[in-house]
UniProtKB/Swiss-Prot annotation:
Pfam families: Ribosomal_S7. This is Small ribosomal subunit protein uS7. Transmembrane segments: none annotated. The gene is rpsG. GO terms for molecular function: rRNA binding; structural constituent of ribosome; tRNA binding. One of the primary rRNA binding proteins, it binds directly to 16S rRNA where it nucleates assembly of the head domain of the 30S subunit. Is located at the subunit interface close to the decoding center, probably blocks exit of the E-site tRNA. One of its GO terms (biological process) is translation. GO terms for cellular component: small ribosomal subunit. NCBIfam families: rpsG_bact. HAMAP family: Ribosomal_uS7_B. PROSITE patterns: RIBOSOMAL_S7. The keyword Ribonucleoprotein applies. It comes from Rickettsia akari (strain Hartford). The keyword Kinase does not apply.
Length: 160
């Protein structure tokens, strides 16, 4: 590891349609091989599908989904005296949203619908209603942290 100062956080421009940095990050996570226009088309088409099918505000649905899937605790592996312990730690907001978007995208891609637009639309709608595979992933992460609560005194970061 380098001993120099930590790399600066890059400034991400908000997306054109909703002027949201969170949505812009989500689009960047959807993107493969630098095809940002295709990623934007997938996300905005999924938003249109949510609006037509469920008659709700798609941007509000997206925000609810991200908020519902965002974890508050996770486990990190800490080596103490030759043994590895899974220590529960708090997740900061930026990492929480990064995990949430990754989990939603992975859950959507594993769905049975034919097109990614349909998969993403359904997963976002389910996550906004506290259902779906992404929500289960969050609950499993919290259960793991709760099960390893006894090792929280090994925490590398102070738990608040």
């Amino acid at each position: 590891m380098s001993r120099r100062h930590a790399a600066e956080k890059r400034v991400i421009l908000p997306d054109m349609k909703y002027n949201s940095i969170l949505l812009s990050r989500f689009i960047n996570n959807i993107m493969k091989k630098g095809k940002k226009a295709l990623a934007e088309k997938i996300v905005y088409s999924a938003f249109n599908k949510i609006e037509k099918k469920h008659r709700v505000d798609p941007y509000q649905t997206f925000n609810n989904a991200m908020h519902n899937v965002k974890p508050h605790l996770e486990v990190t592996s800490v080596r103490v005296g030759g043994a590895n312990y899974q220590v529960p730690t708090h997740v900061d907001e930026r990492r929480g949203y990064a995990l949430a978007s990754r989990w939603i995208i992975n859950a959507a891609s594993k769905r049975s619908e034919k097109m990614m637009i349909d998969k993403l639309a359904e997963e976002l709608f389910e996550a906004s209603n506290n259902r779906g595979v992404a929500i289960k992933k969050k609950e499993d992460t919290h259960k793991m942290a709760e099960a390893n609560k006894a090792f929280s005194h090994f925490s590398p970061k102070k738990m608040q």
